[in-house]
A protein has these predicted regions:
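Extracellular ligand-binding/catalytic regions of CAZymes and related secreted enzymes
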Residues: 11-20, 27, 47-50, 57, ...
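Glycine- and acidic-residue-enriched helix-capping/strand-helix junction motifs
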Residues: 30-48
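Bacterial N-terminal signal peptides
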Residues: 1-5
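Short alpha-beta junction capping motif
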Residues: 23-26, 78-124, 214
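Solvent-exposed loop/turn segments at secondary-structure junctions
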Residues: 29-32, 69-72, 89-93, 114, ...
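Catalytic beta-strand/loop cores that center a nucleophilic Ser/Cys/Thr
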Residues: 136, 144-214
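Extracytoplasmic/secreted envelope proteins and their assembly/folding machinery
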Residues: 48-52, 99-104, 127, 238
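A short, well-structured beta->alpha microelement
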Residues: 58-73
Length: 275
């Protein structure tokens, strides 16, 4: 197992929290391997480096990075963590008993947190407990990594969405989703279809949160490109989500399916009007 850990010294730990939270950042790829999780010469990948540095700079958390779930994603080792974060692809070789423990006792009952980033939605396609937890499954990306897109923020009060303002333009690869469950999630940001060139419009969520039993789940679709990881607003957004999961900042996770329905309807109307 290659578990990368950068430990902050006791003096660096936040006084208010008593001790820093711990995050297990899983960057293993069983499908497509993104450049942002690609380790070179035994060094941390770009996304792992950013998460590790964010933890130290914020005094909020410490990160262990793994690309070996068989070794590091076990019932025994999960006891050490407050949040699990996935930037993964494919069917990860996590033992069934460890998966069951993670979904049920660790996340739902103990009230820990899960953060999925970008291709976390391109993981365990045919495994319902996973997509039921995360909220949706990768269904292609009509907008490739070079696409410049406009994103609308729907809930600027939530700490994960607040850093972005009301609307912003960014260059990144954008996923669309199947197994989408609007009745279970709160969409914080979505693709602005009126400003997007696409013949088949629909609602494309970008950032959402949900309660999962007593646990909290956040999925951030952005993060394909390495320059997104070094974007300060993106980092603040992840930090806001972490603070929300840890209960340090309030944010609403009430599902807003009516927003998804309205966005879908508006996207179709905008497209028809443009023709």
């Amino acid at each position: 197992s290659t578990l990368f850990t950068l430990t902050a010294t006791a003096a660096d730990e936040p006084a208010a929290a008593g001790k820093a939270a711990r995050i297990l950042f899983v960057t293993q790829s069983k499908g497509f391997r993104h450049g942002s999780v690609n380790r070179k010469d035994g060094q941390l990948s770009p996304s792992e480096r950013v998460m590790t540095e964010l933890g130290i700079q914020s005094n909020l958390f410490r990160v262990d990075c793994t690309q070996d779930v068989e070794q590091d994603f076990t019932k025994e080792k999960l006891q050490n963590y407050d949040i699990v974060m996935f930037y993964t692809t494919g069917d990860l070789p996590i033992k069934q008993a460890d998966r069951d423990y993670f979904f049920n006792e660790w996340l739902k009952q103990k009230g820990h947190g899960f953060i999925g980033v970008h291709s976390a939605a391109d993981t365990y396609h045919n495994y319902e407990p996973y997509w039921d937890m995360i909220g949706g499954t990768f269904n292609g990306h009509p907008w490739g990594a070079g696409s410049t897109v406009t994103i609308t923020v729907h809930d600027a009060k939530h700490p994960a969405a607040k850093p972005w303002g009301d609307e912003f333009v960014i260059q990144d690869e954008i996923y669309r989703f199947k197994n989408w469950q609007p009745e279970k999630v709160r969409v914080l940001m979505s693709l602005n279809m009126a400003k997007t060139q696409l013949k088949h419009p629909y609602h494309v969520p970008i950032l959402w949160v949900k309660n999962y039993g007593d646990g909290k789940v956040m999925h951030m679709s952005l993060g394909h490109r390495e320059d997104v990881w070094t974007n300060e607003t993106y980092q603040k957004s992840l930090l806001g989500g972490i603070r929300w999961i840890l209960g340090q900042e309030a944010g609403d996770a009430t599902p807003n399916p009516e927003l998804s329905a309205a966005q879908e309807k508006k996207a179709k109307a905008d497209t028809e009007a443009a023709q």
